[in-house]
Amino acid sequence: MTKLGKPVTQRQLRVGAMINQALGMLFLRDEAKLPNLSTKEITVTEVRMSPDLKTAKIFVMPLGGKDTEEVVTKLKEFSFVIRKVLSKKIVMKFLPKLFFVKDDSFDYAEKIENLIKQTNK
């Protein structure tokens, strides 16, 4: 479900998966050539598309979970370059604007796991 209570469409999921895969390969091969950032260590965990497919919220996490804020800040800084390289890989009428966000799901899962372990003791 989206914020407005509307279900996510199949098209949003398909485009999100396509962008997720393309970004993963782009980061793995370091095709964007971003200065001061090793993109081989960045994991794209999820891509959420807006209903009009004009914006993409990209959840990222560096391997090891170190310097997450710094990595997200640099990705935001170079989002134009990443979008330009991505446009050569994905054929769409409009490539969405990319918004990079820190993925907290691993921290949240670890917190819940610790709570479960505490209740079992």
Language model regions located:
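Charge-rich, low-complexity N-terminal segments
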Residues: M1-T55, M61-K121
